[in-house]
Each structure stands twice: as C-alpha cells, then as structure tokens.
Amino acid sequence: MNNPSDQEPTASFETALCRLEEILEKMNSGTVSLDESLKLYEEADQLIIICNKRLNDAERKIEILVKNRSGELTLGNDDKPIIQDFKIASTS
C-alpha cells in the first residue's frame, strides 16, 4: 500500500485515511530523512486527493437521497441543496 497510484481505483476512504495517519506519525517521529519525507509528502498528497474524491462522491449520493417527492432537490435559503448530516455512533 505504499504506492497511492496503485490504490487509487479501489482505495476506500478509510484505507486512504489510515495510511495518511501512518505517514503523519512517521514524519512526526523525526527519524526519516529529507528524501524519505519528500516521498511520504508526495504519497500523502495523492491520498488526500483520493479522500476528497470519496467525500465528494458521498456528498453527491446524499444530495440524491434528499430529493423531495417531486424529484427535485430540497433547496435551502441559499439556493443550495439541503443535505443531511450523518452522525456516527461512538464505538467506545
């Protein structure tokens, strides 16, 4: 999973986010060389793109689910589609 271009087509949001956390820990450890830090930074940049794509896709799906009975999106006062927040239950 070290090459983000290999992950891009199939990487889930959670997988990409987990790898981003690993990279952050490694870079914050102070034990990596400058060259390795640059490679990790490049990988993190690609993973952020993957995460953004997955989040944008999810937002579009939510907008579809929030359509009113006539098939139109329910719009707020700002003329933007109303989307609903999902609350994730705590696992602790």
UniProtKB/Swiss-Prot annotation:
It comes from the Bacteria. Gene3D superfamilies: Exonuclease VII, small subunit. It is an enzyme of class 3 (hydrolase). It catalyses: Exonucleolytic cleavage in either 5'- to 3'- or 3'- to 5'-direction to yield nucleoside 5'-phosphates. GO terms for molecular function: exodeoxyribonuclease VII activity. One of its GO terms (biological process) is DNA catabolic process. It is found in: Cytoplasm. One of its GO terms (cellular component) is exodeoxyribonuclease VII complex. Keywords: Cytoplasm, Exonuclease, Hydrolase, Nuclease. The keyword Cytoplasm applies. Its EC number is 3.1.11.6. The keyword Hydrolase applies. Belongs to the XseB family. NCBIfam families: PRK00977.1-4 (NF002140), xseB (TIGR01280). Bidirectionally degrades single-stranded DNA into large acid-insoluble oligonucleotides, which are then degraded further into small acid-soluble oligonucleotides. Heterooligomer composed of large and small subunits. This is Exodeoxyribonuclease 7 small subunit.
